[in-house]
Curated annotation (Swiss-Prot):
Annotated source species: Clostridioides difficile (strain 630) (Peptoclostridium difficile)
Protein name (database record): Threonine--tRNA ligase
GO biological process: threonyl-tRNA aminoacylation
GO molecular function (one): transferase activity
Residues where Zn(2+) binds: 333, 384, 509
EC identifiers of the protein: 6.1.1.3
Cofactor(s) listed: Zn(2+)
Gene3D superfamilies assigned: 3.10.20.30, 3.30.54.20, Anticodon-binding domain, Bira Bifunctional Protein, Domain 2, Threonyl-trna Synthetase, Chain A, domain 2
Length: 639
């Protein structure tokens, strides 16, 4: 009997070898209709995969990550088949699934335009309707080369030539179309009904600018048209909220041509950034943290001690000073360790919470840069907590609660991911097991659900990642808690224990915002530029109806300014309707309109960005109301 262990813990038994699809059918016909892929003992396979020995089996639907990857990989093959039907002279390169879709790189003299994409998309839908069976077959390397040479697929020939001579090469065939591929794929083309080709861009073969520029066609696909339409609507909304667009319109930041990847914050952007840092410092002071500022440039010896020189050097900017190697810090961790070693410590000092808003620099390829989301220089809100082994759980819980409070202030929901040991790591198996268990047990005691991300920990320890969910349902990895049992040894951190002997402390690395710049980019898109009052660069704009009310407008401005409210006065000789529209476009939370009646009654006419006309009230009353709103840090998301 073949025993198949399912995800829910149940065991199915079969007398003979059986396909994954038939296992699904044995559970229910409904499941068989919806399943798109599976994993056998952790390896993702197609539904035609034959099970002939005991195994663990997970069945994936489209909504599962693995299911989407297989579905969209098949979509890429359908795209390639459609291209070959319409442009037989095209040569195919590669076509993987990617986050939210797929692409295929092609070599074609004809420059594709949007109208061409519509034709290709229509052909893809036709192929889906044909319900072509997708079959895998394998060939020895020499026969695989012959096949691709016969088809004139030069790029496939190059890929196969790079493989060992003993390699068995797999292909997938659908109708009269065959493509080199590792797989797996759907059983047929019929499920890929909801498809959209989105754009075409240039891409060098194998990412090398010395190679030929190919055309990369991007697309996405879903099981249902309704889901595709919802996704395309989400993309349109995301375009409106793009932080690069809004950052320019609202005068928050710029990326100068002279410094790609090095953002420059403008006056209004600095108001926003400083408000975030003020909030961060307030929260951390209350939680018992002390703040330091470590040097931006440190010598090679330090980075060798930390391990960065061996594990992270390709991401670091290096410089020669007095004929010695130095590096601009890519992380703040070593600075915290230098601070720790600057004085002697007793067990009574713990836990010792050291925070830093440190400027870091990391080398990113120009093609990876994206506004504030991917930069070469940013401020990271690092903290390093030194503690006794018995304090680990409580400190992890404390950090998790602190980060939870920060995210709730902005209206974010989040999910947690526990990342385990990567291949390129420091330390023994026992140390990694202890560190991973410490994080796992803390999360379980807090009752926080989490998923495991195998092999994605830092090289010096496992970590908990916080993935924020914004108002569009997108997720962003921001906060991190890393338990480190390696660097305290590398830096010879010690303390005197109760026994009078030297001991090694345990250390937690943690961030809440992560990159401040990236977090600001997320906030811009999350709020669509309509920041809550406490965060808004300009909280109030005073709009006098005409010049003769300018004196009163200036008095109002002074009173607001003296109360710490960020206020601007529009003193231009423009009509009031124009001023209101401009302030609304600038997304200022409150507009105070002053005219003859307001001067006479010593009032202000209040207009809210989000609620419209509020009416005429006493200035003191307005100041009390907005001050309360600022102090409470209300963060209501407005549509």
């Amino acid at each position: 009997m073949i025993k198949v262990a399912l995800k829910d813990g149940s065991i199915k038994e079969f007398e003979n070898a059986i396909s994954v699809m038939d296992v699904a059918k044995s559970i229910s016909e409904g499941l068989a209709r919806n399943v798109v892929a599976a994993s056998v003992n952790g390896e993702v396979v197609g539904l035609d995969h034959i099970i002939d020995t005991d195994c663990d089996l997970n069945l994936f639907k489209f909504e599962d990550k693995e299911g989407k990857e297989v579905f969209r990989h098949t979509s890429a093959h359908i795209l390639a088949q459609a291209i070959k039907r319409l442009y037989p002279e095209a040569k195919l390169a590669i076509g993987p699934s990617i986050e939210n879709g797929f692409y295929y790189d092609i070599d074609l003299d004809h420059r594709l335009v949007p109208e061409d994409l519509e034709k290709i998309e229509a052909e893809m839908k036709k192929i889906a309707k044909e319900d072509l069976k997708i079959e895998r077959f394998e060939l020895p390397r020499n026969e695989a080369l012959e096949l691709m040479k016969e088809q004139g697929e030069d790029y496939k020939v190059e890929l196969i030539s790079d493989l060992p001579e003993s390699e068995i090469i797999s292909f997938y065939k659908q109708g009269d179309f065959t493509d080199l591929c590792r797989g797996p794929h759907l059983p047929s083309t019929k499920k890929v009904k909801a498809v959209k080709l989105q754009s075409v861009a240039g891409a060098y073969w194998r990412g090398d600018e010395n190679n030929k520029m190919l055309q990369r066609i991007y697309g996405t696909s879903f099981e249902k048209n309704k889901d595709l339409e919802e996704y395309l609507h989400l993309l349109e909304e995301a375009k409106k909220r793009d932080h690069r667009k809004l950052g320019k319109e609202l005068g928050l930041f710029m990326i100068p041509e002279e410094g790609p990847g090095f953002p420059m914050f403008l006056p209004k952007g600095m108001e926003l950034k400083n408000e975030l840092l003020k909030f961060w410092r307030e929260i951390h002071r209350k939680a018992g943290y002390i703040e330091i500022e470590s040097p931006i440039i440190l010598n090679r010896k330090l980075w060798e001690t930390s391990g960065h020189w061996y594990h992270y050097k390709e991401n670091m900017y290096t410089v020669k000073i007095d004929d010695e190697d130095y590096a601009i810090k890519p992380m703040n961790c070593p600075g915290g360790l230098i601070y720790y070693n600057s004085q002697l410590h007793s067990y009574r000092d713990f836990p010792m919470r050291v925070a830093e808003l440190g400027r870091v620099h990391r080398h990113e390829l120009s093609g990876a840069l994206q506004g504030l989301m991917r930069v070469r220089a940013f401020t990271q809100d690092d903290s390093h907590i030194f503690m006794l082994p018995e304090q680990i759980k409580d400190e992890i819980k404390g950090v998790a609660n602190l980060i939870d409070g920060i995210y709730k202030t902005f209206g974010f929901e989040y999910n947690l991911e526990l990342s385990t040991r990567p291949e390129n790591s420091m330390g023994s198996d026992e140390e990694w097991e202890a560190a991973e268990n410490g994080l796992r047990e803390a999360l379980e005691e807090l009752g926080l659900p989490y998923t495991i991300n195998e092999g994605d920990g830092a090289f010096y320890g496992p970590k908990i990642d916080f993935h924020l969910k914004d108002c569009l349902g997108r997720t962003w990895q921001c906060g991190t808690i890393q338990l480190d049992m390696q660097l305290p040894r590398q830096f010879d951190n010690t303390y005197i224990g109760q026994d009078g002997e030297k001991h090694r402390p345990v250390m937690i690395h943690r961030v809440a915002f992560g990159s401040i710049e990236r977090f600001i980019g997320i906030l811009i898109e999350h709020y669509a530029g309509k920041f809550p009052v406490w965060l808004s660069p300009t909280q109030v704009k005073i709009l006098p109806i005409s010049d003769k009310f300018m004196d009163y407008a200036n008095e109002v401005k002074k009173e607001l300014f003296d109360k710490g409210i960020r206020v601007e006065l529009d003193d231009r000789a423009e009509k009031i309707g124009f001023k209101i529209r401009e302030a609304q476009l600038e997304k200022v939370p409150y507009m105070l309109i002053v005219g003859e009646k307001e001067v006479a009654d010593n009032n202000v006419s209040v207009r809210s960005r989000d609620k419209g006309e509020i009416g005429s009230i006493k200035l003191d009353e307005f100041i009390a109301s907005i001050s309360k709103e600022i102090e409470s840090r209300e963060s209501i998301i407005q549509d």
